[in-house]
Amino acid sequence: MYAIFQSGGKQYQVKEGQTIRLEKLNVATGSTIEFHDIMMINDEDNIYIGDPILHNSKITAKVIAHGRSKKLHIIKFRRRKHFRKHQSHRQWFTDLEIINVSY
């Protein structure tokens, strides 16, 4: 059984027991969080599709850790003009463990 839900403007496909990395959520480490913006649930026998979301359904997850991803380097360069520009970025993330998918 898997579900597709929306968080932070992105959609994720998850199963029970799976670990997933999302954009940073302002929730304490070790606490549980519920997602109600579920778009689709695929049970072994049935497929439930929302219009646009499924009502009376939720995904329960446990917050494992917060952190920052590897550094991403952005380099701008113009040939023959002696122009080089360098920037870096590290994105915050939250790791979750999916506990339960219910509908």
Swiss-Prot record:
Pfam families: Ribosomal_L21p. GO terms for molecular function: rRNA binding; structural constituent of ribosome. The keyword Ribosomal protein applies. One of its GO terms (cellular component) is ribosome. GO terms for biological process: translation. It comes from the Bacteria. Keywords: Ribonucleoprotein, Ribosomal protein, RNA-binding, rRNA-binding. Belongs to the bacterial ribosomal protein bL21 family. This protein binds to 23S rRNA in the presence of protein L20. Part of the 50S ribosomal subunit. Contacts protein L20. This is Large ribosomal subunit protein bL21.
